[in-house]
């Protein structure tokens, strides 16, 4: 056990985690040069296309130093804020972490968030300054930043270039000499934490575990403590990006895959504890938090008969991504669909894209919302994720909305833009700190609802892409909120309702109906598009009717003849207007998302 090192790589997006992982894998010879591809740890197509890591991946590396053979378990983590729970999960199973910082960009908001998770887990952190081959690289400035913001001693920081391979050997030596070996006891009852699980079409549900004490062998009967179920171990493997390597036992300190031949991944939930059924543990491994969805949106199939296909697709996707929650819902406008909970906006995009790609579905997504708490006049508390669940106005005492604590790091020249943006989004400043003469760290409390739409894009565009942003949920606060409904031809379209602050309702309503007017196709009758709060109409636009020239067949002659025809047409239009139905195109639902 003294020759095992468990470590993960933490970094902000685009600071070169996956490339560094590639170099370490190559240096240790875990994958032959012929099989090597760039970002080998990113297995999903979406990951490679977007250049992001979504699922944490593991690999077991062998490395010899001073005549001794060492086993290095590398766990690659995502960098994006939506997937930070993947990070906390990965770090819970390590003794050390490589903090990778781009030598030209410096410390970013995400870097700080991930470091705090690592420090809470008492990990040994090795600062790694990456991309030193870039012309704009300034390792000395970056070391100062790490010391100033995070307070880590950077005298032993290692400078590498993952692209060219400079400094990789020194890094491997540092991992072995500075990260402590796992401490566990093989003679104690078996204690293993499931820190990832996924579904394999041939082997069933697989659990990736970190063994703390004892050991697990093939054919053992094990107990999954969360479910209380017993299973036989069919196979054990070490993770490897090309093909896992089989083994007979996993003992204390090791990381490996347990094959139990289960049909359902919910039997091996992430964060659960595995122990031997003949000599079980008294207490499961603690300190592990489940991922809670923050953002909710309705997903509906465009072809209504594909509802069951969507249910199957969500069931299968949940096997690999336990953080999704979903329940069926119906909408007058869109038919049958699901209310799906996500970790954040990027997660929502990725899930929708995976459903459309991997399961060949066409979906409509409604505007994302957060969970509100409603206190009714009769004292009852409700939690709602869908604006249409809001009780009537006279029954509401107050509405509470979730707030987040946001950390933003930006070049100081954009400070004015950012403060304006945050004030428009009802942000409350709690801290402002100059890291260096030209970079500022801001902390704000912001309603979650204000960042769930397009905040990230607006932040990037108002700072030319230089600002970085991270958030964590904080608390619920009373808000001055109302429900804004949209009526088309007198019918309320439930899928377009949103909850907004009263101060913004008027402008939001006006923008809403303007955008809708451009999209609703012209009918043979006039269509009124209205925005309302309760029974009060606050904005209206009219889509003019298409005219048919009924007087074309009259040549000259009496004006009363023409008037009679026009009156008759008017009557007909009135009747049509009373019973006419308007079909809304898909863009109508998307336009709601675009309104600022």
From Swiss-Prot:
EC number(s) per entry: 3.6.5.n1
Domain tr-type G as annotated: residue spans: 2-183
GO molecular function: GTP binding; GTPase activity; ribosome binding; translation elongation factor activity
Gene Ontology CC terms: plasma membrane
Any single biological process term in GO: positive regulation of translation
Family per record: Belongs to the TRAFAC class translation factor GTPase superfamily. Classic translation factor GTPase family. LepA subfamily.
Gene from which this protein is expressed: lepA
Name of the protein: Elongation factor 4
A Pfam family of this chain: LepA_C
Major localization listed first in the record, in broad terms: membrane
Compartment(s) where it occurs, according to its Swiss-Prot or TrEMBL record: Cell inner membrane
Cysteine pairs bridged by disulfides in the record: none
Keywords: Cell inner membrane, Cell membrane, GTP-binding, Hydrolase, Membrane, Nucleotide-binding, Protein biosynthesis
């Amino acid at each position: 056990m003294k020759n095992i090192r468990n470590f993960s790589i933490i970094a902000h997006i685009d600071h070169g985690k996956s490339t560094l992982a590639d170099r370490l894998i190559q240096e240790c010879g875990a994958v032959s040069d012929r099989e090597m591809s760039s970002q080998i740890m990113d297995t999903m197509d979406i990951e490679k296309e977007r250049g992001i890591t979504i699922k944490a991946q593991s690999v077991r590396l062998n490395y010899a130093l001073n005549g001794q053979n060492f086993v290095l378990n590398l766990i690659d983590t995502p960098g994006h804020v939506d997937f930070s729970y993947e990070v906390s999960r990965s770090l819970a199973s390590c003794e050390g972490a490589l903090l990778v910082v781009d030598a030209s960009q410096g410390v970013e908001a995400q870097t700080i968030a991930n470091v705090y998770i690592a420090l809470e887990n008492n990990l040994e952190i090795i600062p790694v300054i990456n991309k030193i081959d870039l012309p704009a690289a300034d390792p000395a400035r970056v070391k100062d930043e790490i010391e100033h913001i995070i307070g880590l001693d950077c005298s032993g920081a290692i400078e590498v270039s993952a692209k060219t391979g400079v400094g990789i050997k020194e890094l491997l030596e540092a991992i072995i000499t500075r990260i402590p070996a796992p401490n566990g006891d093989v003679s104690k009852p078996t204690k293993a934490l499931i820190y990832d699980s996924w579904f394999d079409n041939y082997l069933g549900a697989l659990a990736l575990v970190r063994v703390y004490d004892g050991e697990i062998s093939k054919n053992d009967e094990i107990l999954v403590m969360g479910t209380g179920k017993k299973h036989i171990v069919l196979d054990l493997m070490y993770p490897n990006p090309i093909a896992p390597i089989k083994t007979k036992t996993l003992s204390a300190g090791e990381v490996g895959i347990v094959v139990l031949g289960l049909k359902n991944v919910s039997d091996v939930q992430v964060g659960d504890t595995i122990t031997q059924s003949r000599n079980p543990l008294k207490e499961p491994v603690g300190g592990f938090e489940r991922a809670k969805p923050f953002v909710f949106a309705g997903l509906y199939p465009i072809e209504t008969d594909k509802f069951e296909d969507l249910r199957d697709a969500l069931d299968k996707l949940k096997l690999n991504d336990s953080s999704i929650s979903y329940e069926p819902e119906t909408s007058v406008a869109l038919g049958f669909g699901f209310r799906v909970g996500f970790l954040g906006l990027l997660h929502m995009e990725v899930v929708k894209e995976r459903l459309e790609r991997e399961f060949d579905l066409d979906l409509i997504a409604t505007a994302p919302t957060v969970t509100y708490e409603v206190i009714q006049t009769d004292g009852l508390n409700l939690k709602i994720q869908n604006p249409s669940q809001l009780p009537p106005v006279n029954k509401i005492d107050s509405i509470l909305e979730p707030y987040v604590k946001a950390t933003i790091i930006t070049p100081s020249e954009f400070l004015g833009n950012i403060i304006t943006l945050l004030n428009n989004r009802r942000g409350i400043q709690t801290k402002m700190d100059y890291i260096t003469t030209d970079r500022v760290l801001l902390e704000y409390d912001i309603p979650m609802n204000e960042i769930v739409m397009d905040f990230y894009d607006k932040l990037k565009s108002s700072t030319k892409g230089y600002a970085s942003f991270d958030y964590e949920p904080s608390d619920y606060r009373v808000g001055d909120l109302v429900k804004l409904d949209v009526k088309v031809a007198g019918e309320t379209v439930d899928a377009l309702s949103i909850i907004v602050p009263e101060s913004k309702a008027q402008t939001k309503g006006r923008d809403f109906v303007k955008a809708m007017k451009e999209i609703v196709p012209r009918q043979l009758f006039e269509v009124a598009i209205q925005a309302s709060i309760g029974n009060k109409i606050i904005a209206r636009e009219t889509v003019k009717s298409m005219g048919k020239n009924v007087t074309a067949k009259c040549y000259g002659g009496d004006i009363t003849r023409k008037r009679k025809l026009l009156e008759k047409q008017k009557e007909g239009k009135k009747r049509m207007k009373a019973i006419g139905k308007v079909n809304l195109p898909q863009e109508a639902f998307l336009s709601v998302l675009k309104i600022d």
